[in-house]
Structure formats: C-alpha cells, structure tokens
C-alpha cells in the first residue's frame, strides 16, 4: 500500500507533553511518531533526537524545546516536548510554544508527583484549554487496583485545579511497549487510543482571523487632509473599511470609524490577522492616540490596571537580575508595544523572589492596558528584560 501523502489540508492544532520528570514524556512523544509513521502520518523521531533539543531564545530567555509534527486522520499536530522542568515553566509562561491542549503524562508506578501538580497549575494559569492524560508505565504495575487508585488520584488533582477531572480522558498504556513492539494492548493500541482521545477531546482552536479584531498600535501619523493613520500588525480578526472600532488602553476608551486600510501603499477593503496595515481613523486627532494602545472591535477588550500574573524571573546567566526582589518591586511591564510601570505584591508566604524562580504575583499598573486573560508580557528594568509573565486573572 502506498503511503498517504503528507497534506496540509487538515485543521492544525498545537499540543505538548507535560508532567513530572522521568514519567515518560519524551518516550511518549517518540512512541506517537513511531505508531503514526506506520500509516504515513509522521516520521519516526527517536528518543535521543527529541531529548537533545536545541536551545532557542524567546523574549531573551533561553529555552530548550523539541518540535515534532504528525497527523491523525482528522488533524495535523505540532507537538512540543521539553527536556527539563525549567524549560516547561519558561515555555508555558512566555508562550514560546503556544499550546491549544496538552497530554499530561503520569507514571502509573509513581502516581502524581510535585511537577505533575505544578504543570497542571501552570496549564490552568496560562490558559491551556484542555488536557488528556496518558498513564504511562502500566507494564510495571501488576495490580489493576493500583491503576484505578492512581487514576482516581489524578482525577482529584485535576479537579482541584478547576479542570473537569471527572470527564478528562485517561488512557492507560506504556510508551516503552509501543517503542519495543511489546504487549500491543498497552503499547501500540494505547497510543492509537490516546490520539483518538486527543482528536476528540481537545477542541479545535479558533483561527486568529475568526476572533474579534485587535491591532496593537505601533505608530501614529497625521496625513494632512486625510486625518490620522495608525499602523501595526493585526493580531487577530478582520477590520473592514467603514467599521466602527475602539481605541483602548492608557487613556479613556474612544470610539472611531476606520475609513481606510492601507498595506504596502495600496488601499484595501479590509485588513486581517497577520497583515501589517495602516488604518485611517475618522475625526481622531494625532495627539489622542499613542503607541501602546490597541485598535479593537467595540466591546471586545477592556483596559485594566490590576491583575494576577504567573511570571518567570531570569537568572543571572540569562542576563537577568543578580539579586532577589521583594514586595513593592517597581519594574516596567512591556505589553505588546509599550512599557508601563507597575508595582508587584507577592503572595502571602513568599518573602522574596530569586533570579531563576517562577512566581505568582499581583501587579498594579500606573496606567490601564487593554488586556484579557492569557496576555503575555515582559518584565523590564530600563529596557533590559528581567522576566516574562502571563496575565492569569484580571482583578480590576
């Protein structure tokens, strides 16, 4: 039988493996590529190739991440796997590898461990929409009651972090058996069952173009006789000529109308996600708009000053701070295109934050910024990046 051609006409989804060290995340990643390669949906990538993941820089932070791609009959997947725990923390917080869903790997022999908990919490804080669980190393457990116990424990843990623990699919298997062609019911078959659950349970992400319009403003020009033009790259959605838009953030929200869209000096009927455009705004004065504000579909986003964040603080080797910081630390928070000063309050029980730590914190900005949950930011001191974070919850 000829192999099916690798086509890009299927819906695309970004996923990753998360879970405690040595529970088998990388083995599972290798096993998925091996089993799907049988039907031409992947190229087998061995454990060693995934494990020596190259280092990448995202927002000035060094992260090691392995990327593999594969497809099922329903979808095309880009899958990320990180060698070390710190890489996961950085990856999830910076959004370097955006995850539409994740496979939580738990060893049946050990049950949930500290990093299992931490990765679930991070997934919740950074807004990973859905998880599927792979209970790995089932070949090492003889007692089926023990497997039931571990499953119960995992479900309770998921529920305690506001994931639907009762509904999340948990697939039992062994990545090693799949890689070594042993015990197909927990090897090959379990991998196929896992991928069927991922296909069915992880929702298809909305394409950026289908979301409400938003464009971070990078520059503002005044064109005599025409009005004010704002430029930027459309982050999501579509803006059509003649539509009403809002200017949000820093100052009071103002409504205006987009009377023209220009790209590469050509006039267009609309600008959409990914386009670098200039938008002509009716009746808006040059001094009423500034970099750092956003142009958005009316009512789709609101400005806020107070939020709870999950942040990673760079260590000395990454070019970060050399000393810890405490409550009332006042750095700049860089959102999209601009820096805003903010004050940090640390949670009770956290006295200080050391370089290299990840931390939950409450931030109060001196000016409101257009934000929603999941927005990424950099923490800077005089233009130098000292951390990265994500808005976990808006307070006001």
UniProtKB/Swiss-Prot annotation:
Keywords: Cytoplasm, Elongation factor, GTP-binding, Hydrolase, Magnesium, Metal-binding, Nucleotide-binding, Protein biosynthesis
Positions bound to GTP: 19-26, 81-85, 136-139
Taxonomy, superkingdom: Bacteria
Region listing for G2, in residue ranges: 60-64
EC number: 3.6.5.3
Subunit structure: Monomer.
HAMAP family, A to Z: EF_Tu_B (MF_00118_B)
Function as written in the Swiss-Prot or TrEMBL entry: GTP hydrolase that promotes the GTP-dependent binding of aminoacyl-tRNA to the A-site of ribosomes during protein biosynthesis.
Protein's name in the database: Elongation factor Tu
């Amino acid at each position: 039988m000829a192999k099916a051609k690798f086509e890009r006409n299927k819906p695309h989804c970004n996923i990753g493996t998360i879970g405690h060290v040595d529970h088998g995340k990388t083995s599972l990643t290798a096993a998925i590529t091996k089993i799907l390669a049988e039907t031409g949906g992947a190229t087998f990538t061995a454990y060693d190739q995934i494990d020596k993941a190259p280092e990448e820089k995202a927002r000035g932070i060094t992260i090691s991440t392995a990327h593999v791609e594969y497809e099922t009959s329903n979808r095309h997947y880009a899958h990320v796997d990180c060698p070390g725990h710190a890489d996961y923390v950085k990856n999830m917080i910076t959004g370097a590898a955006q995850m539409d869903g994740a496979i939580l790997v738990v060893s049946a022999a050990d049950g949930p461990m500290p990093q299992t908990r931490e990765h679930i919490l991070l997934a919740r804080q950074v807004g990973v929409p859905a998880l599927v669980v792979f209970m790995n190393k089932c070949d090492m457990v003889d007692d089926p009651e023990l497997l039931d116990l571990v499953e119960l424990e995992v479900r309770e843990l998921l529920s305690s972090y506001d994931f639907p623990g009762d509904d999340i699919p948990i697939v039992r298997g062994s990545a090693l058996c799949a890689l070594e062609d042993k015990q197909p019911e927990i090897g090959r078959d379990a991998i196929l069952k896992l991928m069927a659950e991922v296909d069915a349970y992880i929702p298809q992400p909305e394409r950026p173009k289908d979301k409400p319009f938003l464009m971070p403003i990078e520059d503002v020009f005044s064109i005599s006789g025409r009005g004010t033009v704002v430029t930027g790259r459309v982050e999501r959605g579509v803006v059509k000529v003649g539509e009403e838009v809002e200017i949000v953030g820093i100052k009071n929200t103002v409504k205006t109308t987009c009377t023209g869209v220009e790209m590469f000096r050509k006039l267009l009927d609309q600008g959409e996600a990914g386009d670098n455009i200039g938008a002509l705004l009716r009746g808006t004065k040059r001094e009423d708009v500034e970099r750092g504000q956003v142009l958005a579909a009316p009512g789709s986003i609101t400005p806020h000053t107070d939020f709870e964040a999950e942040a990673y603080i760079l260590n000395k080797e990454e070019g970060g701070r050399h000393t810890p910081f405490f409550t009332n630390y006042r750095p700049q928070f860089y959102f999209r295109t601009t820096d805003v000063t903010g004050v940090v309050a640390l949670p009770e029980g956290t006295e200080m934050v050391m370089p290299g730590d990840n931390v939950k914190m409450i931030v109060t900005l001196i000016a409101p910024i257009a934000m929603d949950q999941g927005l990424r930011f950099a923490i800077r001191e005089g233009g130098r990046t000292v951390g990265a974070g994500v808005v976990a919850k808006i307070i006001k």
